[in-house]
């Protein structure tokens, strides 16, 4: 069975975090929401508190993952970007040729780790500069390029 980990930091966007988890779980895919806050309770950018399945610090590695996923939102995306463990896990996943995905503002994390070099990508409108010069911004609602999927914002939560 496919396995997905979604990283949650305080300030995440609710729809971008929960819609993909709900859809994937309904499809029979094992999805684990992983808190990077040190607590299972993670607060969204609009004050909604979600209980994550796992704590990042209790996981030794993510080698069993088929996909690592990042929801957007602010300051959630910046908080994910500041978490060295998340950055390392994404890089290792990408280097193994496995899938990574980020939506809304969260593609900035993929870009800062260097995973968007030479890739087509999208991001929340107005944040294009966060993709850096190495990515090709497409403006698409959802963009796939190899093992990387990016989404432009809340409206992309379902097709993403």
Predicted regions and their residues:
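Active-site-adjacent pocket-lining segments in enzyme domains
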Residues: 3-6, 12, 23-39, 53-160
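A cross-family phosphate/adenosyl-ligand binding-site feature
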Residues: 44-53
């Amino acid at each position: 069975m496919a396995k997905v980990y979604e990283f949650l930091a305080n300030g995440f966007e609710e729809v971008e975090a929960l819609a993909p988890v709900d859809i994937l779980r309904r499809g029979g895919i094992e999805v684990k929401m992983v808190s990077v806050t040190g607590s299972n309770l993670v607060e969204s950018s609009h004050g909604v508190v979600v209980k994550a399945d796992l704590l990042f610090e209790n996981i030794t590695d993510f080698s069993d993952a088929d996909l690592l996923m990042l929801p957007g939102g602010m300051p959630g995306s910046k908080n994910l970007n500041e978490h060295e463990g998340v950055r390392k896990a994404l890089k290792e996943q990408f280097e193994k040729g496995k899938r990574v995905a980020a939506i809304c503002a969260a593609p900035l994390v993929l870009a800062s780790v260097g995973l968007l070099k030479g890739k087509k990508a999208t991001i929340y409108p107005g944040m294009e500069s966060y993709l850096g010069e190495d990515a090709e911004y497409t403006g698409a609602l959802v963009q796939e390029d190899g093992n990387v999927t990016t989404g432009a914002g809340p409206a992309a939560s379902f097709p993403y």
